[in-house]
Amino acid sequence: MNAATKLPTQLGPIHFTGIGGIGMSGIAEVLLTHGYTVQGSDLKPSKITERLERLGAKIFIGQVGENLADAEVVVISSAIKPGNPELETARARGLPVVRRAEMLAELMRLKSNIAIAGTHGKTTTTTMVATLLDRGGIDPTVINGGIIHAYDSNARAGAGEWMVVEADESDGTFNRLPATIAVVTNIDPEHMEHWGSFERLKDGFHEFVSNIPFYGLAVCCTDHPEVQALVGRITDRRVVTFGFNTQADVRAVNLTYKSGVAHFDILLRNEGQVISGCTLPMPGDHNVSNALAAVAVARHLGMKRDEIRAALAGFAGVNRRFTKVAELGGVTIIDDYGHHPVEIAAVLKAARQASEGRVIAVHQPHRFSRLASLFEDFCTCFNEADVVGISDIFAAGEDPIPGASRDDLVKGLIAHGHRHAVAVPDEDALEALIRAEAKPGDIVVCLGAGTISTWAHNLPARMG
């Protein structure tokens, strides 16, 4: 029995189908760190698979039944569907098949856990909680949904008693995670293909916070009306609220931005104290809000005000969350994962705060179904951008939906009053748009969950 995980040490090779996925790889890395034999497959090599290989994992490119070899357990994510050759082989051999969330729950079982949930901001908030606890000497284990710049990984195996995890609501499995502290950043209609209705999604979040033990804590953002409504439904559990509103227990005040750095004070209402002179080296009210969630957790775990102030000031960020790719002739290129209208609006507001020049947004819509169901919101979320470029939709396996195309969105933006929206069909068109529109002092924000990140990172070579 492994002392750290209480999983049997004699457990043979653990095979991850889709090991390069951001959710799967973190679990694989923690298991590797604890001495388990880990192997896995993915459809193509990546920096993540290369890192896991360096840590000792055996990596297969492509997915065939023979990859399982002498594996004794197979871990899959919700993206792995019936018919996958490795899944079918595992079942034919009678091997245990474990969902990603189930394996994560096993790792969490004998730790005290902080689980961060919400439609937006999970990854950044998870990173901030990890950063603060690391700085406070709590030495947490971390499994995140994005690459933490300070670790150059989405995972960290700590020696402390606390684990920090990103809790993904997309398939409902976040309710299997044994959270001691449950954080909710916001609740918006998303992942309706699983939940079916917004009411069911809200019930899922209620179950998430209701699952905490009597000695646990719910940390909730009451700036968001649906989260405030959730707080009203929580009974018999401790709740700490955060936000900019006057009623919040942990509240940011005196917020200003200078050269893309947030300056603010934090009121700790329940303690009657202030953490003054805080800085966060990234723009965006939403990022300050995420920081407040981390501060609420840190104070609950006994961190000192000076430790919190220093940790926020040194926050190194997370990959694809307002990540600066390059500065080309005085034009800043930003790569961001934002693909929901709420996220896009928040990122563009942050870009406006960070730049004295114009904001040029280039967005790759992610999934036809998302664009179709939120079309009106997509048509109005780019108001902070002076210029908007829209690429072809990243289908993620979906079939096209009438009325939800690149050109439909461009027309919708113009019809809703945007002054400059154009189609950007390929990387050549992106380069041409930047050369024509961007001037020194401007900021170009590439937004989306698909291949737009590659476009952004290719710009320095193309523009050079």
Swiss-Prot record:
Keyword Amino-acid biosynthesis: no
One term under GO cellular component: cytoplasm
Pathways involved: Cell wall biogenesis; peptidoglycan biosynthesis
Pfam families: Mur_ligase, Mur_ligase_C, Mur_ligase_M
First-listed, main subcellular location of the protein, grouped into a coarse class: cytoplasm
Reaction equations catalysed: UDP-N-acetyl-alpha-D-muramate + L-alanine + ATP = UDP-N-acetyl-alpha-D-muramoyl-L-alanine + ADP + phosphate + H(+)
Annotated EC: 6.3.2.8
Protein location: Cytoplasm
Binding site for ATP: 118-124
Protein keywords: ATP-binding, Cell cycle, Cell division, Cell shape, Cell wall biogenesis/degradation, Cytoplasm, Ligase, Nucleotide-binding, Peptidoglycan synthesis
Gene3D superfamilies, per database record: Mur ligase, C-terminal domain, Mur-like, catalytic domain, NAD(P)-binding Rossmann-like Domain
The organism's place on the tree of life at top rank: Bacteria
A single BP term in Gene Ontology: cell division
Function: Cell wall formation.
Family: Belongs to the MurCDEF family.
HAMAP family the UniProt entry points to: MurC
Protein name, UniProt field: UDP-N-acetylmuramate--L-alanine ligase
Protein source organism: Dinoroseobacter shibae (strain DSM 16493 / NCIMB 14021 / DFL 12)
